[in-house]
Structures are given as structure tokens and as C-alpha cells.
Amino acid sequence: MIAKTFSSQGALGKAIPGFQARQAQIDMAEAVAKAITQQSQLVVEAGTGTGKTFAYLVPALLSGKKIIISTGSKNLQEQLFHRDLPLMVDALGFFGNVALLKGRANYLCLDRLSRQMVESHTNEADPQLLTQLVKVRSWSSETKSGDLGECDELPEDSLIIPTITSTNDNCLGKECPSYVDCFVSKARRKAMDADVVVVNHHLFLADLAIKETGFGELIPEAEVFIFDEAHQLPDIASQYFGQSVSSRQVQELAKDIEIGYRTEAKDMRQLQKVGDKLTQSAMELRIVLGEPGFRGNWREALSSPSVARELSRLRESLDFAIDVLKLALGRSQLLDTAFERANLIKGRIDRVCDVSITGYSYWYDTTPRHFSLHITPLSVADKFHEQIELKQGSWIFTSATLAVNDDFSHFTHRLGLKPQAQFSLPSPFDYEQQAKLCVPRYLPEPNSAGLADKLVQILAPVIEQNQGRCFFLCTSHNMMRELGERFREVLTVPVLLQGETSKQKTLAEFMELGNALLVATGAFWEGIDVRGDALSCVIIDKLPFTAPDDPLLKARIEDCRLRGGDPFSQVQLPDAVITLKQGVGRLIRDKNDKGALIICDNRLVTRDYGGVFLASLPPIPRTRDLDKVKDFLSQISVTTQNN
């Protein structure tokens, strides 16, 4: 049945102009069909161009079973639901119901919107935010889904989004005056009735973690579970099987208390004081936690007198909030929920401050305005395995980056998987002709002083000659900022820096300019798809080993050591290989793409483990001569102009 569907005279060939199946795609589709029939686990590494999406959609839709498809990113989730699934549904004549389900932070909350509208009249509102609020209110009367991603007038990084969406903590549930029209409830009900539901890993794992306590109903009772971008699952699972609390939760609580005071309990002036104290104490703790963009060891931070002092003040503010809110119980649903939230947040802070429990990593991270405190299990293998055992069905995991030197054990061990089959699909790209890999000669040591200056000196001529069209992927924010600054001093082509505007705007500007250098870090290493001449060179500053002082890594290393393992080969090296494969994957996106990859790290050729990295990368011809890279890029440029 599968082979027939993928044949030139089959359903796909008839429905999709120019469709040509590849043998690797058929092999994967048959393996997925077998896993569905046998209710087994399957792991497949399938890179760009292999056609993996159709390879799992076809057997899934033909099976007639209830299916959940989970993606790592919202981008892929949207693409699957709006582009790939409709194509397959039409081609196969599928008559089942299909639903898209996102986390509640993506849906407009009508009750919170109406409260914000009232609040905006009583307060000195920012004119720009007020304009956005009015546009959202207008859109709210037209939308069927309530998905804010569909509101074109609203920037994706708008500051009003947290104020007009709900969280698990602040949702009023059935007590909400807008419950009948609630977009989250509608989306969930639709998902419960659907045959195919497209979710993302965060939503799936949040529900799985809730199921662990017996309350997870969000994900319908499916029989087939397919995870695309599955390499992200272990880290995301760690978040959901752990515990966290953030200053954002405290400040949102403070804001809701102030709204309750202004609109429903004007005689309780203490509520204003509660809001002010909560906001102030959260800000003071943020300040003593240090520079933004930092991930630190929470156990160590707690021994700092200034951190202990501000944490104590935050706890006092929460106690004060609980005492005052207790007096307001019964006055309004908003304040009743705020009382519950204050108790929840206090409980979470108590939990993350009990650092005596073994088997967990205690850490914190900071942004310019906020902090988060986390307790994360060092391994989710037992918990994830237990959930799979509880829910008999077919579990299929696929991604472009799962194997390290053709070995899947790093991925399968982290999730406690026991797949009946695991394999990699061969790439359809002709890397011999399409790409060149260079580790330049005379590179400084990766962490040496003046590294940025030296890299700019070596690489500026290549970037200039190529007229930009280049990603420079960095392993740290500091290196990214330093390189961005230096390149702006010496290059004539535009230099874009990640973080100066939103990711989407940065990418759109890069495409529009057509001759830019984009210097970026984490967010651009994966999930970015730039095809054609817009991108013909990817440079990586060094091998992406996680910083040795990262508290999560340190905890995993210690855990590995206690189990008698080798932390470098079992933790640090596999993590870095997977990340490098993701970065390298930005270059060649289809069979017509051509480009050069430059990795500025001698360890690829001077250390034994360099061979593990190289063996895990596509078979790209290698050189150490940057002049050969320039020649290759010149040929690409000439070919493009002639075409």
C-alpha cells in the first residue's frame, strides 16, 4: 500500500505536480507503517530534503488511528498544519478531523482583554500599547480561533501579550465570565474530537507531566505519537518534570492585584501596597542575581548574603500578599484566584530553595528584566519510559540530528527508549559538488585572548568578496557582540546582529538586503531555512561545547561520573556534535543550494575527538586553504549570475 501511494501513478503523484518519491522516503514510510501496526518505537534520523514529513504523514493518515504529531517549533507546527497536512489530506482522500493545538499563551483571553481595556482608561497607558490593545479588541470580534499569531496588527514581541493571555495559574476556569467563548477551551474540545492533532513538544510534555499526577486531559487519548525535531525532547522534558518559578509570575500577579483593586475593591488600599511590594522585591532580587543572559548555580547563589536577603524580602512580600488577599476573599473572582496564585508561587519558591534533594540540578537564569529559578531532574529517562509504558501505542521519533557518528544511544538513553528499529536516511544532496568545508590554517586557540580580532582579520576578506550572504554562528553572546562590533568597523556590507530586533525581523531584513552578514548565536543554529543565493557561506566560531561552568552540565557530568561513565564521551561530546550538525544544516537546504562552511576551531583536526565531529557531518570535501573557499564561492557567484 505504501509503495503504491508513493509511486508515480499513486495518490501523491496524481495530486502533487512533479512529485517524485525517493527510495529512502519509501523506506521510512514503510518503517513508520510497521511501527504503527506493531505498536512499537521507531527512531529515524532524516535530514533536509529527505521528504520525512510525507514519510510519516502518509502511513499515519492511512492507519485510521488517532494521531498526535508534535514539533519542536511553532514554525514547523504551523507549516505542518497549514501546508503539509492539507496537501496529504486531499491527496489521500482523508475524511477525519484535523486540529491544531497550541499552548494557552498563544490564545487571546477575552476576560483579561476586557480588564485591560478598563485598566487602560484608569491608568497613564503607553500610546503605542493602547493602539495595539484597540486593534486586538477589534480583531477579537472577527477571529474564530483566538490565535494571536493570526492577528497581523500585533507584533510577536508585543508587551501586551502577557496581559491579554492566560496562564495555568491565573486562568479563572469555569468561574470566568467569558468561559463559554473561551478560545483555549474551544481549541481543546476540537482537539479532543479530532483524529489528527498537531501540537508542539512544550504542550505535549506539559500535559505528560500533568498526567503523571493524574490530571492530564489536554492531549486526547491517541494511539500514534510522532515527534518531529525530536532531538529537542530530552531538554524540554527536563523542564516539565522539574519545577520553576519566575519574577514574571510575581509581577503578573502584582499587576492583577492592582487591577482587582482599581476595578473591584477600591476600598482596600492595602492591595495597591501589595502590588508595589511584590514588584519591588522581585526587581531587587533580579538586580542582585547579576548580568543578563547568565545561567548560574542556584545552590551557590543562595550562599550569597545579598541574594539570601532579597529572597527573604520576596518571601515576606508574598506572605503580606497572602494575608491581605485573605481579607478580600469573596470580593471578586480575580482576587480569589490571586490568593491561590500567591500561595502557589510561595510553594514553588520553597521547593526550589530546598537544595538538599539529590538527583536534581538547581539553577537560575536572567534576562534584562527577569529571572527564573529552576530545579531540573538530571535524567528524565525513567519518567518518560514510564509514561510510554503506561500508554501503549506507536512512538515515532525523527529529526535531522539524532545520531552521533551513526550511534543513536545518546538520544535513546536520555529518554529511556527501546526502539525496535533505528536508522538514518541517506541525504539526497550531492555534497561533493554543492559544498566545501574549511578549517583555516593559523587559527588561534579557541579561548585565547584577542580571538575576535584575529577571526575578523582572517575572515573579513572572504565575507567581503562574497558580498555578505553569510551567517556567522557564535557559541556565546559575548563573542557574538564582539564580532558584530569589529565587523561593523571593517566591512562595507551590512552587518546584522541577533537581538537588536526580533528573530523574524532580523531574518526578513537579511533576506531583503541580499548582501548582509548576520552574526548570531543559539536561536539561529536551528530552525532557520534560507534557500538559494541569499545564503552561501556559514561560519562557526568554534566547536559548540556547552560552557564548563553551566550548572546543568556540571550536574549531568557529576551524575555520569557517579554512574561510572565517562562524562566527556557520554555527555559533552554528543551534545556538541548534535549542536554542530544543526548549525551546519543551515547551509544546504535543497538540491540547488551551494555554499561554503568554515569552522574556526583547530581541534577538528588536532584532537582525536575531532574525528567524531567530522564523521557525523555530511560528506563535504575539505580544505584548510581559505583561498580555495574564495575560489569556490566565486564560481557559485558566476554560476548564479549566468543563470
Predicted region positions:
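Conserved RecA-like ASCE P-loop NTPase motor core of nucleic-acid helicases/translocases
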Residues: I67-N75, I396-T398, G468-T475, I598-C600
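A substrate-engagement module of RecA-like helicase motors
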Residues: M1-A15, K65-D195, E258, G290-G293, ...
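Signature of the SF2 helicase/ATPase Hel1-core->accessory helical subdomain module
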Residues: L62, E78, R83-P86, S166-E316, ...
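Conserved helicase motor "Helicase C" RecA-like lobe of SF1/SF2 P-loop NTPases
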Residues: T475-G499
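Walker A/P-loop NTP-binding motif
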Residues: A33-K34, T53-K66, R83-L87
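Conserved RecA-like P-loop NTPase helicase motor core
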Residues: P440-G450, E500-V605
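A contiguous, basic/glycine-rich beta-loop/short-helix subdomain that forms a polymer-engagement track
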Residues: P162-V197, L208-F215, F320-L443, G450-Q457, ...
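Conserved pre-motif I regulatory segment
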Residues: M1-V44
